[in-house]
């Protein structure tokens, strides 16, 4: 039995990428992957229902890329997004920050009409 999978890979240097992956986020992911000693890990960003504003962002590490996923590569690090989540993230940027409130990955999302105070949830 033969299975075909369709995976769309986008390189950050391309002009019309659907979602950006910042250098700060890529650098932090590189560090975390090195700590885990698993070079197959990729950062997956996804959207779920919930949070203060209706939808919320989620981040996890994943070893596999599923059929239909979009992958975005920056500095040898891969960001993975499923097709349903990508529609809410188009034109956005996955970034990483460290500050007084702690360290976190976040999404700068131009599609969000409202966001909660912590930035973890949004509505469209």
From Swiss-Prot:
It comes from the Bacteria. Its cofactor is iron-sulfur cluster. Gene3D superfamilies: HesB-like domain. SUPFAM superfamilies: HesB-like domain. Binds 1 iron-sulfur cluster per subunit. InterPro entries: FeS_biogenesis, FeS_cluster_insertion, FeS_cluster_insertion_CS, FeS_cluster_insertion_RrpA, HesB-like_dom_sf. This is Iron-sulfur cluster insertion protein ErpA. It comes from Vibrio atlanticus (strain LGP32). Required for insertion of 4Fe-4S clusters for at least IspG. Iron-sulfur cluster binds at residues 52, 116, 118. Keywords: Iron, Iron-sulfur, Metal-binding. Belongs to the HesB/IscA family. One of its GO terms (molecular function) is 2 iron, 2 sulfur cluster binding. One of its GO terms (cellular component) is cytosol. One of its GO terms (biological process) is iron-sulfur cluster assembly. Homodimer. The gene is erpA.
